[in-house]
Amino acid sequence: MSTAVLENPGLGRKLSDFGQETSYIEDNCNQNGAISLIFSLKEEVGALAKVLRLFEENDVNLTHIESRPSRLKKDEYEFFTHLDKRSLPALTNIIKILRHDIGATVHELSRDKKKDTVPWFPRTIQELDRFANQILSYGAELDADHPGFKDPVYRARRKQFADIAYNYRHGQPIPRVEYMEEEKKTWGTVFKTLKSLYKTHACYEYNHIFPLLEKYCGFHEDNIPQLEDVSQFLQTCTGFRLRPVAGLLSSRDFLGGLAFRVFHCTQYIRHGSKPMYTPEPDICHELLGHVPLFSDRSFAQFSQEIGLASLGAPDEYIEKLATIYWFTVEFGLCKQGDSIKAYGAGLLSSFGELQYCLSEKPKLLPLELEKTAIQNYTVTEFQPLYYVAESFNDAKEKVRNFAATIPRPFSVRYDPYTQRIEVLDNTQQLKILADSINSEIGILCSALQKIK
């Protein structure tokens, strides 16, 4: 038998919302103090009656209960119950009895919101719909210093792009856009200028994939690629996919998408009055900066590792992971032979900074995540400092080691077959993982034998 305690989950939620997990969730949309309890029992006569009797003896009032066959163990049933908030004082004793007398495995979210609470995180790729529209800035609204603030045509256009993102749901094809001539002109200026630097300044992986994007995705000076075409291409390369977004997401939400190999991508383009400047990510930054390297297996895995590390992490570690992301995925340099090349999207989409970062002006340091994670950075001018990775694989291992220091009571892995995050917090989940690894090792050994 196993149980999980959740606080403030929202009384409208059903057992089916929780999938097959023992769930670590704090749902911030309900603050009424109610408690929900998930537990599983072996399918035998009187099993549920024992638990209900335990509740009665401890003056616990059930306001809702539902059941279903367990998705983890065929001989068990799962029960989802709502407990009256007045039952809170008895909860500690109930959990103690479940653990010691009934042999339950209990996972509890703290009832003290000031400490130890695990933040909510998406468990299925469909749950990205929950926060994709919770943007922090821009979208259809522009600040007064934005180049397009006084342009009514540009503002109306931005609203069109925002509406596309707001109405999008996972599984739908990304709507195609008929870009205007002025938008194509802006793209062409950026594309032509940056492409002239890629062979000498961009990393090998970037230059390897860029011709394929030209061939299969319409990366041309006179054409703005469609996100749906690019997303389909990415999925065939690394399993990454694009999802339209209206503006900037919080660090937690954005990194959470990477855990599912989903990149939240803007569809609008910068204002034509300043083609070489944008105060926000736009389609030039996304497609010319990010997309080529999301097509590389090693870099895609590295990016996903950052996302997985963010799931359920405390706020202070989200800030550290966001800083690591900034100095790697956005503004990273790497060694290649005797040279140093750029792989960060912020560099590969900025003509001026791409030249500057490989000059003698900035300071270069080796990538050490303990130091990188707390390094201050600027968002209004070129970076005075860049971190140099030995390789994508080296950076990936460093992220894994850093993730091991994050204080959370579980580990996670992504299941690409079900597109779910598996929380590894019980022996059943570990057995499933071990079986999967054993199967992969068997394939590896068989292949090695045939190669010999």
Swiss-Prot record:
It holds the Pfam family Biopterin_H. Changing residue 277 to C: In PAH deficiency; severe. Changing residue 311 to P: In PAH deficiency; severe. Changing residue 65 to V: In PAH deficiency. Changing residue 177 to L: In PAH deficiency; severe. Phosphorylation at Ser-16 increases basal activity and facilitates activation by the substrate phenylalanine. Changing residue 170 to R: In PAH deficiency; severe. Changing residue 377 to C: In PAH deficiency; severe. Changing residue 261 to Q: In PAH deficiency. Changing residue 230 to I: In PAH deficiency. Residues 36-114 form the ACT domain. Changing residue 217 to G: In PAH deficiency; severe. Changing residue 247 to V: In PAH deficiency; severe. This is Phenylalanine-4-hydroxylase. It comes from Homo sapiens (Human). The gene is PAH.
